[in-house]
Design a protein with these regions (language model features):
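A conserved beta-strand-loop-helix scaffold within acyl/acetyltransferase catalytic domains
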Residues: 4-84, 231-236, 248
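A short, well-structured alpha-helix characteristic of acyl/acetyltransferase catalytic modules
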Residues: 12-24, 173-190
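A conserved beta-turn-beta hairpin within the catalytic core of GNAT-like acetyltransferases
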Residues: 67-77, 87, 109, 186-191
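Conserved acetyl-CoA pyrophosphate-binding loop and the N-cap/start of the following alpha-helix
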Residues: 86, 90-98
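Conserved GNAT acetyl-CoA-binding A-motif
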Residues: 103-116
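Conserved catalytic-core motifs of GNAT/GCN5-like acyltransferases
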Residues: 114, 124, 128-151, 232-235
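Amphipathic alpha-helical blocks and their helix-capping loop/short-beta junctions
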Residues: 139-187
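Charged, low-complexity intrinsically disordered regulatory/assembly segments
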Residues: 187-251
Length: 251
Protein backbone atom coordinates (compact mmCIF):
# COMPACT_ATOMS: atom_id res chain seq x y z
CA UNK A 1 0.00 0.00 0.00
CA UNK A 2 1.31 3.40 -0.99
CA UNK A 3 2.67 5.67 1.75
CA UNK A 4 0.53 8.68 2.59
CA UNK A 5 1.51 12.31 2.98
CA UNK A 6 -0.50 15.03 4.74
CA UNK A 7 -0.98 18.55 3.41
CA UNK A 8 -3.62 21.27 3.44
CA UNK A 9 -6.52 21.07 0.99
CA UNK A 10 -6.83 24.32 -0.96
CA UNK A 11 -8.51 23.61 -4.31
CA UNK A 12 -12.14 23.10 -5.26
CA UNK A 13 -11.24 19.64 -6.54
CA UNK A 14 -9.71 18.71 -3.20
CA UNK A 15 -12.75 19.95 -1.29
CA UNK A 16 -14.97 17.92 -3.63
CA UNK A 17 -12.77 14.96 -2.73
CA UNK A 18 -13.54 15.58 0.95
CA UNK A 19 -17.27 15.42 0.22
CA UNK A 20 -16.86 12.19 -1.73
CA UNK A 21 -14.82 10.65 1.08
CA UNK A 22 -17.64 11.40 3.51
CA UNK A 23 -20.09 9.59 1.23
CA UNK A 24 -17.78 6.59 1.03
CA UNK A 25 -16.79 6.42 4.70
CA UNK A 26 -20.13 7.23 6.35
CA UNK A 27 -22.80 6.29 3.79
CA UNK A 28 -24.93 9.22 4.93
CA UNK A 29 -27.37 11.20 2.77
CA UNK A 30 -25.94 14.39 1.28
CA UNK A 31 -27.95 16.49 3.75
CA UNK A 32 -25.78 15.11 6.56
CA UNK A 33 -22.43 15.79 4.86
CA UNK A 34 -20.22 18.86 5.18
CA UNK A 35 -20.51 20.41 1.71
CA UNK A 36 -17.81 22.01 -0.40
CA UNK A 37 -19.03 25.54 0.34
CA UNK A 38 -18.79 24.94 4.08
CA UNK A 39 -15.18 23.76 3.74
CA UNK A 40 -14.28 26.75 1.58
CA UNK A 41 -15.99 29.37 3.76
CA UNK A 42 -14.53 28.00 6.99
CA UNK A 43 -11.05 28.31 5.45
CA UNK A 44 -11.71 32.01 4.92
CA UNK A 45 -12.74 32.26 8.59
CA UNK A 46 -9.51 30.78 9.95
CA UNK A 47 -10.26 27.08 9.64
CA UNK A 48 -8.48 24.54 7.46
CA UNK A 49 -8.71 21.04 6.06
CA UNK A 50 -5.79 18.61 6.05
CA UNK A 51 -5.83 15.81 3.50
CA UNK A 52 -3.96 12.51 3.50
CA UNK A 53 -2.81 11.62 0.00
CA UNK A 54 -1.52 8.38 -1.51
CA UNK A 55 0.06 9.75 -4.63
CA UNK A 56 -2.62 11.92 -6.23
CA UNK A 57 -5.49 10.17 -4.45
CA UNK A 58 -6.99 11.66 -1.31
CA UNK A 59 -7.54 8.82 1.16
CA UNK A 60 -8.49 10.83 4.25
CA UNK A 61 -9.07 14.30 5.62
CA UNK A 62 -9.73 16.18 8.84
CA UNK A 63 -11.63 19.47 8.92
CA UNK A 64 -10.61 21.96 11.62
CA UNK A 65 -12.54 25.06 12.67
CA UNK A 66 -11.11 28.06 14.48
CA UNK A 67 -12.98 28.25 17.78
CA UNK A 68 -13.35 30.33 20.92
CA UNK A 69 -14.55 28.80 24.20
CA UNK A 70 -14.98 31.57 26.75
CA UNK A 71 -11.64 33.37 26.83
CA UNK A 72 -9.86 30.39 25.31
CA UNK A 73 -8.82 30.40 21.65
CA UNK A 74 -8.89 26.78 20.59
CA UNK A 75 -9.81 24.55 17.68
CA UNK A 76 -12.81 22.39 16.84
CA UNK A 77 -12.40 19.19 14.84
CA UNK A 78 -15.65 19.02 12.91
CA UNK A 79 -15.25 15.90 10.76
CA UNK A 80 -12.65 13.30 9.82
CA UNK A 81 -13.06 10.61 7.17
CA UNK A 82 -10.78 7.88 5.82
CA UNK A 83 -11.32 5.80 2.68
CA UNK A 84 -12.47 2.27 3.51
CA UNK A 85 -9.40 0.59 2.02
CA UNK A 86 -7.14 2.81 4.14
CA UNK A 87 -8.98 2.41 7.45
CA UNK A 88 -7.11 0.76 10.36
CA UNK A 89 -3.79 1.62 8.72
CA UNK A 90 -2.81 4.67 10.77
CA UNK A 91 -4.17 7.33 8.42
CA UNK A 92 -6.57 8.76 10.99
CA UNK A 93 -3.82 9.01 13.61
CA UNK A 94 -1.48 10.68 11.12
CA UNK A 95 -4.15 13.27 10.34
CA UNK A 96 -4.85 13.98 14.01
CA UNK A 97 -1.18 14.42 14.91
CA UNK A 98 -0.74 16.72 11.93
CA UNK A 99 -3.77 18.66 13.13
CA UNK A 100 -2.16 19.01 16.56
CA UNK A 101 1.08 20.32 15.05
CA UNK A 102 -0.75 22.88 12.94
CA UNK A 103 -2.88 24.04 15.88
CA UNK A 104 0.17 24.42 18.13
CA UNK A 105 1.80 26.52 15.44
CA UNK A 106 -1.21 28.84 15.60
CA UNK A 107 -0.88 29.18 19.37
CA UNK A 108 -3.84 26.94 20.21
CA UNK A 109 -3.62 24.73 23.29
CA UNK A 110 -6.84 22.73 22.94
CA UNK A 111 -8.91 21.02 20.25
CA UNK A 112 -12.43 19.79 20.91
CA UNK A 113 -14.73 17.36 19.07
CA UNK A 114 -17.50 14.84 19.71
CA UNK A 115 -18.14 11.15 19.23
CA UNK A 116 -20.91 8.64 19.86
CA UNK A 117 -20.29 7.15 23.34
CA UNK A 118 -21.56 3.75 22.20
CA UNK A 119 -18.76 3.33 19.62
CA UNK A 120 -15.91 1.37 21.21
CA UNK A 121 -13.53 1.86 18.30
CA UNK A 122 -13.85 5.64 18.42
CA UNK A 123 -13.47 5.64 22.20
CA UNK A 124 -10.23 3.64 22.04
CA UNK A 125 -8.81 5.91 19.33
CA UNK A 126 -9.71 9.19 21.01
CA UNK A 127 -8.87 8.30 24.61
CA UNK A 128 -6.04 5.78 24.36
CA UNK A 129 -4.25 6.63 21.14
CA UNK A 130 -4.68 10.41 21.18
CA UNK A 131 -4.94 11.08 24.92
CA UNK A 132 -8.12 13.15 24.81
CA UNK A 133 -10.25 13.54 27.95
CA UNK A 134 -13.98 14.03 28.48
CA UNK A 135 -16.01 15.87 31.10
CA UNK A 136 -19.17 16.69 29.13
CA UNK A 137 -22.06 14.57 27.83
CA UNK A 138 -24.49 16.03 25.28
CA UNK A 139 -27.88 14.36 24.99
CA UNK A 140 -29.36 14.09 21.47
CA UNK A 141 -26.80 16.60 20.19
CA UNK A 142 -27.78 16.46 16.50
CA UNK A 143 -31.39 15.33 16.91
CA UNK A 144 -32.81 11.84 16.44
CA UNK A 145 -30.58 9.71 14.21
CA UNK A 146 -32.55 7.97 11.48
CA UNK A 147 -29.73 7.29 9.06
CA UNK A 148 -27.09 5.09 10.64
CA UNK A 149 -25.24 3.75 7.58
CA UNK A 150 -24.23 0.54 9.36
CA UNK A 151 -27.85 -0.52 9.75
CA UNK A 152 -30.44 -1.82 7.34
CA UNK A 153 -33.32 -0.01 9.03
CA UNK A 154 -33.77 3.50 10.41
CA UNK A 155 -32.68 3.48 14.03
CA UNK A 156 -34.56 6.41 15.54
CA UNK A 157 -31.99 6.69 18.37
CA UNK A 158 -30.96 9.94 20.06
CA UNK A 159 -27.63 11.26 18.77
CA UNK A 160 -25.91 11.42 22.17
CA UNK A 161 -22.29 12.58 22.12
CA UNK A 162 -19.26 12.79 24.36
CA UNK A 163 -17.28 16.04 24.09
CA UNK A 164 -13.55 15.41 23.78
CA UNK A 165 -10.99 17.93 25.00
CA UNK A 166 -7.53 17.43 23.55
CA UNK A 167 -5.01 19.25 25.73
CA UNK A 168 -2.23 19.53 23.16
CA UNK A 169 0.50 20.16 25.74
CA UNK A 170 -0.49 17.72 28.47
CA UNK A 171 2.21 15.20 29.52
CA UNK A 172 -0.01 12.37 28.27
CA UNK A 173 -0.54 13.86 24.81
CA UNK A 174 3.09 14.94 24.46
CA UNK A 175 4.22 11.38 25.24
CA UNK A 176 1.77 9.81 22.80
CA UNK A 177 2.75 12.29 20.09
CA UNK A 178 6.37 11.18 20.47
CA UNK A 179 5.41 7.52 20.14
CA UNK A 180 6.08 6.81 23.82
CA UNK A 181 3.83 5.19 26.39
CA UNK A 182 1.52 7.56 28.21
CA UNK A 183 2.19 8.21 31.91
CA UNK A 184 0.55 5.62 34.17
CA UNK A 185 -2.74 6.83 35.55
CA UNK A 186 -4.20 6.24 38.99
CA UNK A 187 -6.82 3.55 39.51
CA UNK A 188 -10.18 4.63 38.04
CA UNK A 189 -12.82 5.56 40.59
CA UNK A 190 -15.72 4.70 38.27
CA UNK A 191 -16.34 2.86 35.00
CA UNK A 192 -19.09 3.01 32.40
CA UNK A 193 -19.61 -0.17 30.37
CA UNK A 194 -20.82 -0.26 26.77
CA UNK A 195 -21.62 -3.22 24.49
CA UNK A 196 -18.57 -4.34 22.52
CA UNK A 197 -20.61 -4.62 19.29
CA UNK A 198 -23.06 -1.74 19.31
CA UNK A 199 -24.15 -2.01 15.67
CA UNK A 200 -24.93 -5.70 16.06
CA UNK A 201 -27.03 -5.00 19.16
CA UNK A 202 -29.06 -2.30 17.39
CA UNK A 203 -29.73 -4.69 14.51
CA UNK A 204 -30.73 -7.57 16.75
CA UNK A 205 -32.66 -5.78 19.49
CA UNK A 206 -33.32 -2.07 19.01
CA UNK A 207 -35.30 -1.87 22.24
CA UNK A 208 -32.42 -3.31 24.24
CA UNK A 209 -30.02 -0.95 22.49
CA UNK A 210 -32.17 2.01 23.49
CA UNK A 211 -32.10 0.82 27.12
CA UNK A 212 -28.32 0.48 27.03
CA UNK A 213 -27.93 3.97 25.58
CA UNK A 214 -30.14 5.43 28.31
CA UNK A 215 -28.13 3.63 31.01
CA UNK A 216 -24.83 4.91 29.62
CA UNK A 217 -26.24 8.44 29.45
CA UNK A 218 -27.29 8.42 33.10
CA UNK A 219 -24.02 6.90 34.31
CA UNK A 220 -21.97 9.53 32.49
CA UNK A 221 -24.17 12.33 33.80
CA UNK A 222 -23.71 11.01 37.33
CA UNK A 223 -19.93 10.79 36.89
CA UNK A 224 -19.60 14.27 35.43
CA UNK A 225 -21.83 15.72 38.16
CA UNK A 226 -19.15 14.43 40.56
CA UNK A 227 -16.48 16.29 38.53
CA UNK A 228 -14.88 13.05 37.33
CA UNK A 229 -12.83 12.99 34.13
CA UNK A 230 -13.02 10.24 31.52
CA UNK A 231 -9.43 9.57 30.42
CA UNK A 232 -9.17 5.91 29.46
CA UNK A 233 -10.92 2.99 27.80
CA UNK A 234 -10.68 -0.80 28.01
CA UNK A 235 -11.87 -2.97 25.14
CA UNK A 236 -13.32 -6.43 25.68
CA UNK A 237 -14.96 -9.17 23.64
CA UNK A 238 -18.30 -8.99 25.43
CA UNK A 239 -18.26 -5.44 26.72
CA UNK A 240 -15.90 -2.49 26.90
CA UNK A 241 -15.70 0.21 29.53
CA UNK A 242 -14.81 3.85 29.95
CA UNK A 243 -12.46 4.70 32.83
CA UNK A 244 -13.16 7.77 34.96
CA UNK A 245 -10.72 9.42 37.33
CA UNK A 246 -10.44 12.21 39.83
CA UNK A 247 -9.25 15.33 37.99
CA UNK A 248 -5.50 15.87 37.93
CA UNK A 249 -3.60 19.00 36.96
CA UNK A 250 -2.37 19.06 33.38
CA UNK A 251 -4.43 16.15 32.05
Amino acid sequence: MEETTVRECTTIEEFDGCVQLQREAFGLPDLELSPRRHLIVSRQAGGWTLGAFAGDRMVGFVHHLAAVHGNEISGYSHVMAVAKDYQNKGVGARLKWAQRQRALGEGRAFIKWTWDPMRARNAHFNLNRLGATVDTYAENFYGIDYDDPALTERTGLPSDRLFATWNLNSPRVVALAAGASAPVQAKPVMTVAIPAEWTALVKQDASRAREQQARVREEFKKAFAQQLICAGFERGDEQSRYLLFEPQKGT
